């Protein structure tokens, strides 16, 4: 597909050079560009991030191959999240943009071009079935079940527990925990060996408690719990026995001293970079972007391991339900350069530059043709990723009510540090929810 488009664009460019002075249409339904136009791409990365550096290399090759100039603007997370929608609403030229799959397909969904036909060849040749399913679902959730494709996945990730295999071996732990009881036993061995079992950063505490609650009551139950509204037939309150059980099992780990003594004060990225990466803590809850973020702090003897959040007794979901997500690239429905934008998507997300992204940014490959290109640091993630059959939203939906999310984060930190027991946690959350 890429070769066909490149050839077509080169032919158009040659023909244009022979008919200087002849009249031409100002635009076309196909979205092809006029001579001298630039493709404008707003990127979520900061310019010094490895992802941005690979993208710049892909753009350079794209410009050389096609003659199409690209104005790439690296906005960073804050710049993208605060500036993109106002710019799109004001009809500013932005042909291509990216961000996380739910934000693009949900919050910015009305600006997206339908890619169903344009991406058919791409999907069959390069598309990861799981990632495309997530992208389709993300759009459908906020558009009355419309499951047409409006974005192309890249930079996939999974959220769960990373662990230090070296420390597990030192503590005599022979198998990866798959249940809460097995995690309890592993933490006991780590503590006995003088090793901090689990650490976490403030940025991921809502994800921590969200996952934990979802194991007991499922994601719809979590959403119903925090919003106070029924979700897909589920209605759950903070008095629910399974919610109490979740709080009690979490508090039990705090009482046993399994959580880092710094968990009450850890500000991202202190837990991952100052405790886990140097080898002071054996387990950290984080996403698969961790090896890239922590690479400058990693102990020489750290051997990377990963396991999905464990199953709990009588829980609704087991450890095959996980938050697998990705960034996505999307084309502005008003773009006059849709074909060129899609071709740039191909350059970034497939073949050489997708593989380079796995090497430089230590991320999961996007192109199914690169399925053997997982970084060594993420080798243990692949089995857990492939075993996932139920796909959680970010934090298993526990951040669905902005009014109580700050209260939840603060009191999860208190619960994990032992400053609050299970009953106290439930009481505070009931009050925050107005129950």
Predicted regions and their residues:
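Short, solvent-exposed loop/beta-turn-alpha elements that line the ligand-binding surface or hinge
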Residues: 116-134, 218-245, 296-299, 311-320, ...
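Extracytoplasmic/periplasmic solute-binding protein
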Residues: 144-154, 159, 184-235
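Glycine-centered hinge/linker elements that transmit conformational signals in sensory
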Residues: 187-189, 231-264
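C-terminal capping/gating helix-and-loop segments adjacent to ligand/active sites or protein-protein/ligand interfaces
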Residues: 144, 322-323, 359-371, 376, ...
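Conserved N-terminal structural module of periplasmic/extracytoplasmic solute-binding proteins
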Residues: 4-8, 20-111, 120-129, 175, ...
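Hinge/lid segment of periplasmic solute-binding proteins
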Residues: 101-159, 184
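Short helix-initiation/N-cap motifs at beta->coil->alpha
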Residues: 74-83, 180-184, 263-277
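Extracytoplasmic/periplasmic substrate-recognition and gating elements
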Residues: 60, 65, 69, 89-90, ...
């Amino acid at each position: 597909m890429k070769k066909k488009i490149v050839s077509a664009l080169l032919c158009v460019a040659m023909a244009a050079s022979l008919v200087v002075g002849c009249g031409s249409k100002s635009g076309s339904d196909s979205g092809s560009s006029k001579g001298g136009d630039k493709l404008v791409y707003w990127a979520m990365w900061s310019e010094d991030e490895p992802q941005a550096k690979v993208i710049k290399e892909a753009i350079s090759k794209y410009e050389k191959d096609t003659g199409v100039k690209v104005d790439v603007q690296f906005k960073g997370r804050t710049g993208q999240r605060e500036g993109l929608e106002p710019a799109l609403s004001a009809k500013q030229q932005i042909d291509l943009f990216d961000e996380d799959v739910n934000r693009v397909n949900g919050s910015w969904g009305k600006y997206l071009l339908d890619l169903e036909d344009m991406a058919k060849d791409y999907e069959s040749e390069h598309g990861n079935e799981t990632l495309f399913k997530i992208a389709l679902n993300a759009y459908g959730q906020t558009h009355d079940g419309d499951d047409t494709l409006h974005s192309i996945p890249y930079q996939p990730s999974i959220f769960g527990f990373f662990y230090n295999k070296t420390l597990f071996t030192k503590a005599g732990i022979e198998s990866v925990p798959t249940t809460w009881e097995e995690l309890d036993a592993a933490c006991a061995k780590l503590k006995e060996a003088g090793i901090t079992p689990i650490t976490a950063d403030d940025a991921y505490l809502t994800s921590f408690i969200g996952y934990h609650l979802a194991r007991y009551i499922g994601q719809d139950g979590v959403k119903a719990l925090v919003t106070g509204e029924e979700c897909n037939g589920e209605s759950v309150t903070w008095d629910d026995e399974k919610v109490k059980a979740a709080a009690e099992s979490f508090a039990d780990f705090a009482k046993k001293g399994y959580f880092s003594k710094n968990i009450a004060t850890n500000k991202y990225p202190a837990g991952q970079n100052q405790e886990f990466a140097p080898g002071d803590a054996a387990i950290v809850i984080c996403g698969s972007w961790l090896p890239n973020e922590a690479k400058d702090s990693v102990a020489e003897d750290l051997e990377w391991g990963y396991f999905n959040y464990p199953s709990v007794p009588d829980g609704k979901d087991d450890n095959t339900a996980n938050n697998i997500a990705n960034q996505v690239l999307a084309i502005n429905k008003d773009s006059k350069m849709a074909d060129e934008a899609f071709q740039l998507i191909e350059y970034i997300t497939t073949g050489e530059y997708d593989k380079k992204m796995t090497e430089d940014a230590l991320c999961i490959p996007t192109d199914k043709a690169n399925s053997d290109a997982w970084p060594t640091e993420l080798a243990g993630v692949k089995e857990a990723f492939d075993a996932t059959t139920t796909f959680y939203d970010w934090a298993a939906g526990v951040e669905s009510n902005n009014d109580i999310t700050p209260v939840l984060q603060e009191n999860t930190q208190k619960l994990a540090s032992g400053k609050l027991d299970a009953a106290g946690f439930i009481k505070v959350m009931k009050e925050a929810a107005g129950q």
